[in-house]
Amino acid sequence: MRQLVFALCVFASPALAELEQARDMMEAGQFEAAREELLPAARSGNAEAEELIGVMYGLGLGVEQDYERAFEWYLRSSMKGHPGAQSGVGWYYELGLGMPAPDLVRAYMWYTLSAIGGDPDAAISLEEVVKKMTAEQIEKAHVLVNDYKAWMYPFR
């Protein structure tokens, strides 16, 4: 068992170092280099790297701004339980960015999942989106939340 824990620590450390280095590059305004640093981890399914690439596309940092690409990267990260990305997906649904039209039901769902996951800002987003929704939409959103919550957060 100790060998397994040791092996996990050894192999996880380079990935964590790459993410920290990419964050440092982003803070220094070196977005193209940060993206190159993040892509291997993101393509391997690292939720944090996926979320950061979503941020880059959403804001046009080192890449041409592209809401559809941003949404896709956020969604990948969200499906792995990343609370920040879940709030991002909620925001994209709320405003209809990268899609044909807003979808308040799904915005509510993702904000709720984000709040369950620990994003402190998700509750504020939930309060705002509820103001735009009908009772029927909220009811539909609760059904989706319960479906996703059971799968995404089985122990909460």
Predicted regions span which residues?
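Terminal, low-structured helical/coil segments at or just beyond the last alpha-helical repeat
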Residues: 121-156
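N-terminal signal peptide c-region/cleavage motif recognized by signal peptidases
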Residues: 12-14
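Short helix-capping/linker turns of helical repeat alpha-solenoids
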Residues: 30, 43-46, 59-61, 66, ...
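Hydrophobic face of amphipathic alpha-helices that form TPR/SEL1-like repeat modules
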Residues: 19-25, 41, 52-59, 88-95, ...
